[in-house]
From Swiss-Prot:
Transit peptide location: 1-39
GO biological process, one term: response to nutrient
Protein's UniProt keywords contain Lipid metabolism: yes
Alphabetized UniProt keyword annotations: Disease variant, Lipid metabolism, Mitochondrion, Phosphoprotein, Transferase, Transit peptide
UniProt-recorded Gene Ontology molecular function terms: identical protein binding; succinyl-CoA:3-oxo-acid CoA-transferase activity
Primary site of residence: mitochondrion
Protein name: Succinyl-CoA:3-ketoacid coenzyme A transferase 1, mitochondrial
EC category: transferase
Catalytic activity as recorded in UniProt: a 3-oxo acid + succinyl-CoA = a 3-oxoacyl-CoA + succinate; acetoacetate + succinyl-CoA = acetoacetyl-CoA + succinate
Primary gene name: OXCT1
Outcome reported for the amino acid change (mutating E280A): In SCOTD; uncertain significance
Record InterPro entries: 3-oxoacid_CoA-transf_A, 3-oxoacid_CoA-transf_B, 3-oxoacid_CoA-transferase, CoA_trans_fam_I, CoA_transf_AS, CoA_transf_BS, NagB/RpiA_transferase-like
Family, per entry: Belongs to the 3-oxoacid CoA-transferase family.
């Protein structure tokens, strides 16, 4: 009621001003608010912008790989020497850049991330018990941050059901002898419309360190290309959001409809002094390249899988492809069809690798490789990307595996105590019943160990989620109740040959055919 009275009073004043002959934009500038008026504070020194971050604070740090990381603010934290931080970030950069610098200086106590990746120091500190790591599916991480900024305390998601995320027991901290000192807690489970969902709690931070492209002097912000990623939801989820930009422009330089983050979310703003904008994986399409080839010329096994996987693409399909064989399969998409490639870091409409002069640090795929986009492409934030994925709007996801069970369980993210890469977006990608999940992999592991098994022995990525398995020997369809059916067999092999290298029984289709290959 008080707000309505204020509005009514203001309108009367404005009407009076207009009636008295005053010019509207000079004689009456009306501003209504039911909360305290707040302005974005501008800084010239990044250390000044972060010097009040205390020991033990929870800090949200934007970026995906090295794309869109707040370089200057991270360097400022190195100078302040703040300790015991809980850093919430999709990953931790590399050993000598990005958050990897704060790991090396032992300023981070706990990482909340989806992916360890190729940061050897991150993995070493975790496995040796020096660092606490809360591994969280990438889409769940993005949604937990989004929910925190929106005032939603918790939500249900299908991602992670039937895995250590739901069951608890995932190592957060190891003892020096390799035993588990701190383990994750189990999640509450509920069933909606016949599908299981787990309860995840929102994430908020004491501070958010965000990298954007430009800001105006009111504090409105825009991002560039795929550097939007986690930066956008993190802007909204902290008590104090500090944004660094490459350029500050005058008010009015942005059309209102082009603003990505309104000023209300931005508390502190600084123009970065310098940017290295390092590229983690520079992938170049050389001049004169002809037909696309597999990564290792002459590797018949991989090429055989790739050329079969390429037959899974259909005209008009939206697809998300994992690194390695799945992504290489996109090189063989028929020119007669259109496939829209989605990347979980916030791109729809991926194109081929760039020429040398086209490489752009702000345009990468989920494998952190430089890419291009096709006409009609779009960019969006990580939470938006996983709304597409979790919501079943992606028709096909193709990814690799360490193990697949007879009934479609998938394991591809960790070997306890030995190898931890993190689940990244994989748990989210296999969580929607509307999305076809195709696994591409070599039939056996080193030493001819089985990868297709009665039951997975490694921690699961998804439960009963795989629809099809493609190896160099065979193609299987997967039924969640009946198990495997052999539908294609590589020329020269027998069913018995495949059975000997498979760790479970399977049915044979009455329409069994030779393994198909897309034409070059």
């Amino acid at each position: 009621m008080a707000a309505l009275k204020l509005l009514s009073s203001g309108l009367r004043l404005c009407a009076s001003a207009r009636g008295s002959g005053a010019t509207w934009y000079k004689g009456c500038v009306c501003s209504f608010s039911t909360s305290a008026h707040r302005h974005t504070k501008f800084y010239t020194d990044p250390v000044e912008a972060v010097k009040d971050i205390p020991d033990g604070a929870t800090v949200l740090v934007g970026g995906f790989g090295l794309c869109g990381i707040p370089e200057n603010l991270i360097d400022a934290l190195l100078k302040t020497g703040v300790k015991g931080l809980t850093a919430v970030s999709n990953n931790a950069g590399v050993d000598n850049f990005g958050l990897g610098l704060l790991l090396r200086s032992k300023q981070i106590k706990r990482m909340v991330s989806s992916y360890v990746g190729e940061n050897a120091e991150f993995e070493r500190q975790y496995l040796s018990g020096e660092l606490e790591v809360e591994l969280t599916p990438q889409g769940t991480l993005a949604e937990r941050i989004r929910a925190g900024g929106a005032g939603v305390p918790a939500f249900y998601t299908p991602t992670g059901y039937g895995t250590l995320v739901q069951e608890g027991g995932s190592p957060i901290k190891y003892n020096k002898d390799g035993s588990v000192a701190i383990a994750s807690k189990p999640r509450e489970v509920r069933e909606f419309n016949g599908q299981h969902f787990i309860l995840e709690e929102a994430i908020t931070g004491d501070f958010a360190l965000v990298k954007a492209w430009k800001a105006d002097r009111a504090g409105n912000v825009i991002f560039r290309k795929s550097a939007r990623n986690f930066n956008l939801p993190m802007c909204k989820a902290a008590e104090t959001t500090v944004v660094e930009v490459e350029e500050i422009v005058d008010i009015g330089a942005f059309a209102p409809e082009d603003i990505h983050i309104p000023q209300i979310y931005v508390h502190r703003l600084i123009k970065g002094e310098k940017y290295e904008k390092r590229i983690e994986r520079l992938s170049i399409r050389k001049e004169g390249d002809g037909e696309a080839k597999s990564a290792k010329p002459g590797d018949d096994v991989r090429e055989r899988i790739i050329k079969r996987a390429a037959l899974e693409f259909e005209d008009g399909m939206y697809a998300n492809l994992g690194i390695g064989i799945p992504l290489l399969a996109s090189n063989f998409i028929s020119p007669n069809i259109t496939v829209h490639l989605q990347s979980e870091n916030g791109v729809l409409g991926l194109g081929p690798y760039p020429r040398q002069h086209e490489a752009d640090a702000d345009l990468i795929n989920a494998g952190k490789e430089t890419v291009t986009i096709l006409p009609g492409a779009s960019f969006f934030s990580s939470d938006e990307s996983f709304a597409m994925i979790r919501g079943g709007h992606v028709d096909l996801t193709m990814l690799g595996a360490m193990q697949v069970s007879k009934y479609g369980d998938l394991a591809n993210w960790m070997i306890p105590g030995k190898m931890v890469k993190g689940m990244g977006g994989a748990m989210d990608l296999v969580s929607s019943a509307k999305t076809k999940v195709v696994v591409t992999m070599e039939h056996s592991a080193k030493g001819n160990a089985h990868k297709i098994m009665e039951k997975c022995t490694l921690p699961l990525t998804g439960k009963q989620c795989v629809n099809r398995i493609i190896t160099e020997k065979a193609v299987f369809d997967v039924d969640k109740k009946k198990g495997l059916t052999l539908i294609e067999l590589w020329e020269g092999l027998t069913v018995d040959d495949v059975q000997k290298s498979t760790g479970c029984d399977f049915a044979v289709s009455p329409k069994l055919m030779p393994m198909q290959q897309i034409a070059n």
